[in-house]
Design a protein with these regions (language model features):
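C-terminal ends of transmembrane helices
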Residues: 39-52, 94-98
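Structured cytosolic domains appended to multi-pass membrane proteins
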Residues: 124-302
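Small-residue-rich segments of transmembrane alpha-helices in multi-pass membrane proteins
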Residues: 1-6, 58-71
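Short, non-helical or kinked segments that cap or interrupt transmembrane helices
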Residues: 46-65, 76-77, 85, 105
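Structural signature of hydrophobic alpha-helical transmembrane segments
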Residues: 22-35
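Membrane-interfacial segments at transmembrane helix termini in multi-pass membrane proteins
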Residues: 85-143
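Gly-rich Lys/Arg/Thr-decorated short loops/hinges at beta-loop-alpha junctions or inter-strand turns
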Residues: 5, 37, 112-124, 150, ...
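Loop-to-transmembrane alpha-helix initiation sites
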Residues: 30-32, 74-89
Length: 302
C-alpha cells in the first residue's frame, strides 16, 4: 500500500505524466490503492487484543516489503535493500511471536483469530487487595525463594536498575532470586532480557517461563512488575477468554504474589486479569521504580 501511495504521489506531484499514465490508468492506480487500504482495515479489525502483538509484528514486515516495492518503483537500490531487510526481520519476528503465543502463521493470515468471545454471566466483581511497601517488606524479609516477573511496565518506569538493587538485597538476606521471562513480555521478544542485562543481572538468573513454571508452586513470593496478559490465568482456565491457549508465567501458583502497577487498568489485550483478585495476590500501586526503590530502602534501614 505504501508503495502504491508513493507511486501516486510521485506521478501527481512531479511532471505532468512521468510514467506515461493515461487518465484511466491513474484512476486504476487510485482505485487499487483504495481497495488495498480497505483490505488492510478489514483484515485488522476482527483481530482480538490478545493477538495484536503478532499482527503488529506482521504489519512491520509488510511495511518493509512496501518500502522495497517503492524502491523498485523509483529505482532506489538503498530503499530496496533496506526494505527487504525490514521485511525479512519482521517476518522472522512474527514467526517467533506466533510460536511464543501458541498461534500458527496460517491462522494469522487466513483467520480472524483471537476475536473476543462472549462470556457467561459473572458474579460480583472482587476488589483487589492492596498493601503498603512497609508490609510488603515484612513478607519479603522472610522469603527464601523469590521470582521476579518483569513486563512492559518495568520498561516504561526504567526500573531495571532498582530491580537489580532489590535482587542484591534479597540475596544478601539469604533468598534465592530468579527472573521468569515470558517470550513476548514487553514489546518484542528479548525486550526484558536486554533491560536486565543492561542492569547487570546475571544471565543464569534469567529463566524462561517453561523453566520456571514447574517450580512456581515452591516460590514464596512472585513479584510481577508491570506485566499483565503474560500472567493472566484465564489463558489456562477460561476457554471464553481471547487469551486462551497462550502460554503464560504461572505466577498465580506462588504462595504470595506482589503486583506492582500504576492502577487497575487492563493489559494490551483489554481483558481483566483475575490474578489481581486472587486470595494470594496483593497490589502495590504506584510507579514501579519508586516502589522497588522504597523496598530497597526498607532493606537498607533494617
Amino acid at each position: 500500500v505504501l508503495g502504491l501511495v508513493s507511486i501516486i504521489a510521485y506521478s501527481f506531484f512531479t511532471s505532468e505524466n512521468p510514467f506515461g499514465f493515461a487518465e484511466i490508468e491513474k484512476c486504476g492506480v487510485i482505485a487499487c490503492t483504495a481497495i488495498f487500504l480497505l483490505l488492510g482495515f478489514t483484515m485488522v479489525i476482527p483481530i482480538g487484543g490478545g493477538d495484536m502483538p503478532v499482527i503488529i509484528s506482521f504489519l512491520n514486515a509488510l511495511s518493509g516489503l512496501a518500502a522495497a516495492f517503492a524502491g523498485f518503483a523509483i529505482n532506489n537500490t538503498v530503499l530496496v535493500v533496506s526494505g527487504c531487510l525490514v521485511g525479512a526481520s519482521g517476518l522472522i519476528l512474527t514467526l517467533i511471536m506466533c510460536k511464543a503465543m501458541n498461534r500458527t502463521f496460517g491462522s494469522l493470515l487466513f483467520k480472524s483469530f483471537g476475536g473476543q468471545k462472549k462470556k457467561g454471566a459473572a458474579g460480583p466483581a472482587k476488589e483487589p487487595k492492596s498493601m503498603s511497601v512497609e508490609d510488603a517488606y515484612m513478607i519479603l524479609e522472610a522469603a527464601k525463594n523469590v521470582v521476579f516477573v518483569p513486563g512492559y511496565g518495568m520498561a516504561v518506569a526504567q526500573a531495571q536498575h532498582a530491580v537489580k538493587e532489590l535482587c542484591d538485597k534479597l540475596e544478601e538476606n539469604g533468598a534465592e532470586v530468579n527472573f521468569a521471562i515470558h517470550p513476548v513480555a514487553g514489546r518484542m521478544p528479548g525486550h526484558m532480557n536486554v533491560l536486565l542485562a543492561e542492569a547487570n543481572v546475571p544471565y543464569e538468573q534469567l529463566k524462561t517461563a517453561d523453566e520456571m513454571n514447574p517450580q512456581m508452586s515452591n516460590v514464596d513470593v512472585a513479584i510481577v512488575i508491570g506485566a499483565n496478559d503474560v500472567v493472566n490465568p484465564d489463558a489456562i482456565h477460561d476457554e471464553s477468554s481471547p487469551l486462551y491457549g497462550m502460554p503464560i508465567v504461572n505466577a498465580h501458583e506462588a504462595r504470595t504474589v506482589f503486583v506492582l502497577k500504576r492502577g487497575k487498568g487492563t493489559g494490551f489485550s483489554g481483558v481483566e486479569n483475575p490474578l489481581f483478585t486472587n486470595d494470594n495476590t496483593v497490589m502495590i500501586y504506584g510507579d514501579a521504580k519508586a516502589t522497588v526503590s522504597a523496598l530497597v530502602s526498607e532493606f537498607a534501614d533494617n
